[in-house]
Amino acid sequence: VDLMEKNTKQMLQLVNQILDFRKIQNGKMRLHVSLFNLNEMVDSFEKEFRVMAEENEVSFTFQLAGEDIMVWADKEKVAIVIRNIISNAFKFTPAGGNIYVTMGVSDDDRHCYVRVEDSGVGIPQSKLSEIFERFSQADNARGAYYQGTGIGLALSKEIISLHHGEIYAESPEGKGAVFTIELQLGKEHYKPSEVDFYMGGETVSVPEAESVSASAGKESEESDFATDDDDDF
């Protein structure tokens, strides 16, 4: 029963990823951007993956930021990306290995980051530029661990790009891999032509970038952004 539930969950996840990827390709992906605590999200993943770490006999270390990191982003979509990256680290790290998750804010306070490092086999340098492409597979000694559609990393890159952020991988071959997710702080980077501002259950048009910046002082209020597209695809 557990195996059946696991396979069903994986299949559903794959279907959802394919649908999301198609929405992005067609320019129909909606972002529901709200202000949330990135520390709390990352901390929830520590609890979620702790059991897996024990089952796989992998050392799992989390280092949260010293202060709360409040970020304007699509919470659900960002969670998908972070979960994908941590899941990959477990997938490619053998028993006795190590996985480190760290986060923080850049020195210039312009963006925040979540970094996932593993001690697995790593990724060939020739493949680093390809792993974020759809259906890409890394070809190395543990190639069996890289089988699959490859859509997870491709979807992750597209989601982060919609947020005007970056995601990239580094890997000294044979020494594991490091994936870094960067999100800009604030909300001025969201284009007014692409964003609607939700406040108090009402939709307010944001025609100018200054309007977005001016509302930054209200970040403590419950607010949302959404791209100005419908959900159809």
Regions found by a protein language model. Name each.
Residues 32-47, 79:
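A conserved beta-strand-to-alpha-helix junction within the catalytic ATP-binding
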Residues 6-11:
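Short alpha-helical segment of the dimerization/phosphotransfer core of two-component systems
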Residues 22-33:
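Helix-loop junction within the histidine kinase core
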Residues 164-170:
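Glycine-rich ATP-binding loops of the HATPase_c
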Residues 32-37, 54, 59-69:
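Conserved catalytic submotifs in the C-terminal HATPase_c
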Residues 89-90:
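Short helix-loop "hinge" at the ATP-lid/N-box region of the Bergerat-fold HATPase_c
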Residues 123-135:
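Short conserved segment of the HATPase_c
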